[in-house]
């Protein structure tokens, strides 16, 4: 076997021995185990829903016997471990992660509000009025007609809108006026076509 292969095997062996030890350093998690009869038991986090809220630590005599949640005094007696000997103790909180969650949540909320304002400004005229009154306005509030429709069909400023052409073979009829609630006079008239019914 080459020295490179032997070295990688040694690194793998050390890693496989240290990895469970690192995972078991967290005293609030009872890892999965196989008992002396060969039955597999799933891991769990202490306290379980059925446990007292003071039972926050995982107690066991060795890795092949029943694991259960216990309190601090029982943990120190069973595991022969002094939890308060460390500089930060066992119940340290990760405040930097909590701060990160709050900052991330703030940015997500900000993006949601900005998205709502943009959607409202594009679709509702009353929102444009209020945003302009509050000093929030700009080019982004003007909707480009070519943006959503077909650019070949979109009328350019200063050009009249193209009139719909009747299909060949039909007789042109007089246009009818379109009545709307707003009183738009810029709408093109609707064309009626003859249809045959059997």
Swiss-Prot record:
Keywords on record: Glycoprotein, Membrane, Signal, Transmembrane, Transmembrane helix
Superkingdom, taxonomy of origin: Eukaryota
Record has Glycoprotein as a keyword: yes
Stretches of the chain found on the membrane's Cytoplasmic side: 118-198
InterPro entries, per the entry: Shisa, Shisa_N
Membrane spanning residue stretches: 97-117
Biased composition range(s): Pro residues: 157-170
Residue ranges annotated as Extracellular topological domain: 25-96
Localization: Membrane
Signal peptide: 1-24
A Pfam entry, by short name: Shisa_N
Glycosylation sites: 52, 94
The keyword Transmembrane helix belongs to this UniProt entry's keyword annotation: yes
Membrane topology: Single-pass type I membrane protein
Region (Disordered): 145-198
Gene Ontology cellular component list: membrane
Family membership: Belongs to the shisa family.
Record-given protein name: Protein shisa-like-1
Gene responsible for this protein: Shisal1
